[in-house]
């Protein structure tokens, strides 16, 4: 049981409180303490892989396995070959026997050489992945953040920091901003004006929530102009909530104190066009906490018309939303608190309205009319997208999130016309995705769920076309099948092609496809076999769809290349991340395997990470990593180097992930299974994955652990008390980072989406609590980690959990991060967090490794 010192000092997982992390070989009972001076040895170098363990598992110094291959003495050979009469030796027989032995030995040696994988020798020379690697420049993926600005040109940032304009057709480059200038301004973000005359920089940026921030902004003429501060007329040196260019010339807006300011061009005084804002209460053009985190998934809540003459913006009113306070314990004699509006399940939600203002001439503010539908008494606005310069598409979603109405609103009158309606018995998924419009706005493509047989609905492209002199639209499905379209990228009118990403290849992959929008809707994969060691792509097309930027995201090292749409031919590489490729080629990277398991008529994918030196004859600890947020995906062919990589590479663990019921991209039947049953079905599926792994001879059944963060922290807490077939605990230990422990304490939009409206029927909320689960803990080590100023999942969740753990006399440890937010923005804190988690599991696996020896000593003493 963790000591009181460990529980409350915050040092339970530091390098002083845990012994130095052992090598993978030590975790597996290989190198003994007496060999420490020899330095770490790779796992595969300790004993021949084919050598069987001697039964009883005991023997040799340091607890190392003994092997049955032993040399026989000369006397043994004499007795066997000659008999008991010494003078009568058969020298010829001895010579023949020795010759046979030599031949057999040579055959064995030859076989070992031929059958040993060629990589084994090189593996022993490679380094193991460490926590330091995660934060080193060698492993930092560079994303050029390329953005198309014309049919043939895009802007990107090179590794040295300079901002480059690249012409695809002429293959020429122009430096717009030197990297040194960005460094001198201490700028964190930059943006180029549409006419390429000015650059906008932000510096001294201070994060607010996941996406939002405040910062100082300056404007500078390209390439070498002096910076000039961007401020509202009434304030100098103001810290702004947002600033950004419009679609034309040098027009820009910025937001200060939740009010919107407009500037027609650089040098002209900004005018306040929206002035109803109230700090922390009424947001104009920006999201409040709930919309930023759960609905729009961005802090930006304003949208320019294509011609720059109008601006649509949301007004979000939090005045009736209950206030949460985030305490600050350090830096003052008395703790202080930061209040903000946070709606929990069943509480008052923010109200929202959508407005359009004209930017040419006198400001005219017009509110778009919401649907007149009794199911929409409370609603969210989940998507806004301009179709033309006077028409704007808006998606309205009921608070219960089971009814949505897509409308097309007239920006000159405020009248909204219904274009599509969707309804679900569970919840509506993927509600903030934007449709793609034709130039005249009469045709648009959007993704909707379509029935595809026994697996329920899958998300496919539908085209809606307005008919002349008719109020009814013609709707057709472009794609179909038991796979999902994950994103519509572009519509090429001149070629009648739609471009999109999908899971048609496999759910864990993302390939780029095109489909004809006429005739039989013929479909073609553009990215299949296009890039070596890459099956997970994203892409962006030039405005005319003649070229596209193709971003490989895995399983190999991410790259970015430019292609011609006509023949898919690669024109050039924009980024290859060779430094990362070199770094991982020098490391013992995990081996990745994929399997499927069967449970309750479902085939569920699992991902297994094994040490590079993996052998079937060794015994490895098993770590189950859970996420499982409904609609998410854990098993994907994406490149990542994380603390899990360190756990596998440096500490010889096997890591497994499973996409069970509630996960995305496998049909709505599997997705919606967890409705009003959070926790129970996920437990069943994750435990089935563990049971499958425990059948493998290379898994040590005494060293099994579970980890999760956020919703995954909820699941890891839910799973930890699980029992095996013999009613013994399956897990030796577990850890939860920022766990949700009671959904009535969490965000309204999230909890109500999956458990229903709180207050109408609370049984689903009560059943989902982890309190009734943790009372069944039987001595398993449990590490709970939480930041005290977590704005997303309040420390209140962990406080409630600890209360239950104390009542149940559980063996828990608590690690807090004082005054830190949910996202751990500091690299130093992230590094400490990773070390803490790794140290906990290394110690857990080491203790379990010693238990059999301790038991044996106790038995000897009793005898």
From Swiss-Prot:
This is A-type potassium channel modulatory protein DPP6. Glycans are attached at residues 171, 402, 469, 533, 564, 811. It comes from Bos taurus. Belongs to the peptidase S9B family. Residues 39-51 have a biased composition (Low complexity). GO terms for cellular component: plasma membrane; voltage-gated potassium channel complex. Predominantly expressed in the brain. Isoform DPPX-L is expressed exclusively in the brain whereas isoform DPPX-S is found in brain, kidney, ovary and testis. Residues 115-863 are extracellular. Disulfide bonds join 409-416, 525-528, 534-552, 733-844. The gene is DPP6. InterPro entries: AB_hydrolase_fold, Peptidase_S9_cat, Peptidase_S9B_N, Serine_Prot_S9B/DPPIV.
């Amino acid at each position: 049981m963790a000591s009181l010192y460990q529980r409350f000092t915050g040092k339970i997982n530091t390098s002083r409180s845990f012994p130095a992390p052992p090598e993978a070989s030590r975790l597996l009972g290989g190198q003994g303490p007496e060999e420490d001076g020899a330095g770490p040895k790779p796992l595969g170098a300790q004993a021949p892989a084919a050598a069987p363990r001697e039964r009883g598992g005991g023997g040799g110094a340091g607890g190392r396995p003994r092997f049955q291959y032993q040399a026989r003495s000369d006397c043994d050979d004499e007795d066997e070959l000659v008999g008991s009469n010494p003078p009568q030796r058969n020298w010829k027989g001895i010579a023949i026997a020795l010759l046979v032995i030599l031949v057999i030995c040579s055959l064995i040696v030859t076989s070992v050489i031929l059958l040993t994988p060629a990589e084994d020798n090189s593996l022993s020379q490679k380094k193991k992945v460490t926590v330091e690697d995660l934060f080193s420049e060698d492993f930092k993926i560079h994303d050029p953040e390329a953005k198309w600005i014309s049919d043939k040109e895009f802007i990107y940032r090179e590794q040295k920091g300079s901002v480059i304009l690249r012409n695809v057709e002429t293959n020429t480059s122009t430096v717009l901003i030197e990297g040194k200038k960005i460094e001198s301004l201490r700028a964190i973000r930059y943006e180029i004006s549409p006419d390429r005359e000015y650059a906008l920089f932000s510096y001294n940026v201070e994060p607010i929530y996941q996406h939002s921030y405040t910062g100082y902004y300056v404007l500078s003429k390209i390439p070498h102009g002096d910076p000039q501060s961007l401020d509202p007329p009434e304030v100098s040196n103001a810290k702004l909530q947002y600033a950004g260019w419009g679609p034309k010339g040098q027009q820009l807006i910025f937001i200060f104190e939740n009010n919107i300011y407009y500037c027609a061009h650089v040098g002209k005084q900004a005018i306040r066009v929206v002035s109803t804002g109230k700090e922390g209460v009424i947001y104009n053009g920006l999201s409040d906490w709930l919309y930023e985190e759960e609905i729009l998934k961005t802090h930006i809540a304003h949208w320019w018309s294509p011609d720059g003459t109008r601006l649509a913006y949301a007004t979000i009113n939090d005045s009736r939303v209950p206030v949460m306070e985030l305490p600050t314990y350090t830096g003052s004699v008395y703790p202080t608190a930061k209040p903000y509006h946070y709606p929990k399940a069943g509480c008052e939600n923010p109200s929202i309205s959508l407005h359009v203002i004209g930017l040419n001439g006198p400001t005219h503010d017009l509110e778009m009319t919401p649907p007149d539908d009794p199911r929409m008494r409370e609603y969210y606005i989940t998507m806004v997208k301009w179709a033309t310069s006077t028409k704007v598409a808006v998606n309205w979603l009921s608070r219960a999130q089971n009814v949505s109405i897509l409308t097309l609103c007239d920006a000159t009158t405020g009248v909204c016309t219904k274009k599509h309606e969707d309804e679900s018995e569970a919840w509506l998924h993927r509600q903030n995705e934007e449709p793609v419009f034709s130039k005249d706005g009469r045709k648009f493509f959007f993704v909707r769920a379509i029935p595809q047989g026994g697996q329920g609905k899958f998300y496919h492209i539908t085209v809606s076309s307005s008919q002349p002199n008719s109020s009814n639209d013609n709707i057709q499905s472009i794609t179909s099948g038991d796979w999902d379209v994950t994103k519509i990228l572009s519509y090429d009118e001149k070629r009648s092609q739609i471009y999109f990403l999908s899971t048609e290849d496999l759910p864990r992959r993302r390939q780029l496809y095109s489909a004809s929008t006429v005739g039989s809707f013929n479909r073609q994969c553009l990215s299949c076999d296009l890039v070596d060691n890459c099956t997970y792509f994203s892409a962006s097309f030039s405005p005319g769809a003649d070229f596209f930027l193709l971003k490989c995201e895995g399983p190999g090292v991410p790259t970015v290349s430019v292609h011609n749409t006509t023949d898919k031919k690669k024109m050039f590489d924009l980024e290859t991340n060779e430094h990362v490729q070199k770094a991982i080629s020098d490391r013992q990277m995990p081996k990745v395997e994929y399997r499927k398991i069967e449970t309750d008529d479902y085939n569920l994918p699992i991902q297994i990470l094994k040490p590079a030196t993996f052998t079937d004859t060794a015994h490895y600890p098993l770590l189950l990593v859970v996420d499982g947020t409904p609609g998410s995906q854990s098993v994907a062919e994406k490149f990542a180097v994380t603390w899990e990589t360190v756990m596998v590479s440096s500490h010889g663990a096997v890591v497994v992930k499973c996409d069970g019921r509630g996960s995305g991209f496998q049909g709505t039947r599997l997705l919606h299974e967890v409705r009003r049953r959070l926790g129970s079905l996920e437990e069943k599926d994750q435990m089935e994955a563990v049971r499958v792994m425990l059948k493998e001879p290379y898994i040590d059944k005494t060293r099994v652990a579970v980890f999760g963060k956020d919703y995954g922290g909820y699941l890891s807490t839910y799973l930890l008390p699980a029992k095996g077939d013999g009613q013994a605990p399956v897990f030796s230990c577990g850890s939860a980072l920022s766990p949700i422990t009671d959904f009535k304490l969490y965000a309204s939009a999230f909890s109500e989406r999956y458990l229903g409206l709180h207050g109408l029927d609370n049984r689903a909320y009560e059943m989902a609590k982890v309190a009734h689960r943790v009372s069944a803990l039987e001595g398993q080590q449990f590490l709970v980690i939480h930041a005290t100023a977590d704005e997303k999942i309040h420390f209140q969740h962990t406080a409630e959990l600890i209360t239950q753990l104390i009542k149940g006399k559980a063996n828990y440890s608590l690690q807090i991060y004082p005054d830190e937010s949910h996202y751990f923005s500091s690299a130093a804190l992230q590094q400490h967090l990773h070390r803490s988690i790794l140290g906990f599991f290394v110690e857990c696996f080491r203790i379990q490794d010693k238990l059999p020896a301790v038991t044996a000593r106790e038995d000897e003493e009793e005898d």
